[in-house]
Swiss-Prot record:
The keyword Thylakoid does not apply. It comes from the Bacteria. Pathway: Cofactor biosynthesis; pyridoxine 5'-phosphate biosynthesis; pyridoxine 5'-phosphate from D-erythrose 4-phosphate: step 5/5. It comes from Nitrosococcus oceani (strain ATCC 19707 / BCRC 17464 / JCM 30415 / NCIMB 11848 / C-107). Belongs to the PNP synthase family. It is an enzyme of class 2 (transferase). This is Pyridoxine 5'-phosphate synthase. The active site is at H48 (proton acceptor), E75 (proton acceptor), H196 (proton donor).
Amino acid sequence: MIASHAILLGVNIDHVATLRQARGTRYPDPIQAAIEAEQAGADGITLHLREDRRHIQERDVALLRDVLVSKMNLEMAVTGEMLAIAEKYCPEDCCLVPERREELTTEGGLNVTGQLARITEACVRLKEAGTRVSLFIDADPRQVEAAAQANAPVIEIHTGHFADARDERNRRKEFQRIVEAVKRGREVGLQVNAGHGLNYQNVAAIAALSDIVELNIGHAIIARALFTGMQSAVGEMKRLMREARE
């Protein structure tokens, strides 16, 4: 499954906003981070507007719409409020994710099979607004097939279980689940992206899967940027992804 075509990088800027919100200041500015990420080669900017507004604020979404050169991938829960916000700002991409207020970060994939009608309706609304929909799902063929039934053109495979595996046996097991989910996604005609928990040590294995179009990575890049700067951190991730396809 290794190929030479390029793989895209969406840089998630949520944790720049996390640092800002920790003190309620105007800095660091996630908008500046997005601009620097683009200058370093990011193919898109991802941000998650959570219901509790713990990091990204609606104002950030509005400002980014005016300055992004690449594309916006807005992550959000499947709620009436969030759908209305997406319809207001019309991001190029919108990734529907599960959300629980008590979680530190998104802990698992969307249960598409358990709420097919609701997610299908959300996909219709977003498509009518001119936004391409992605569903963030676990590496489960049943969820992949349900995503296709919901008429979502894109899925993002949750790579967190692979990234968090404590030993090589479990890591191989989770990797194989991803491989099978990617294969099933292509069989049912979906674009397949991936993300969550990817870092400079584990990204190559996922980036080497030729049927994956885009990786969305945030925490590892922002953490590296604290020491090396945003452009260097993004550039290094792009290099690792590119080399995995060579």
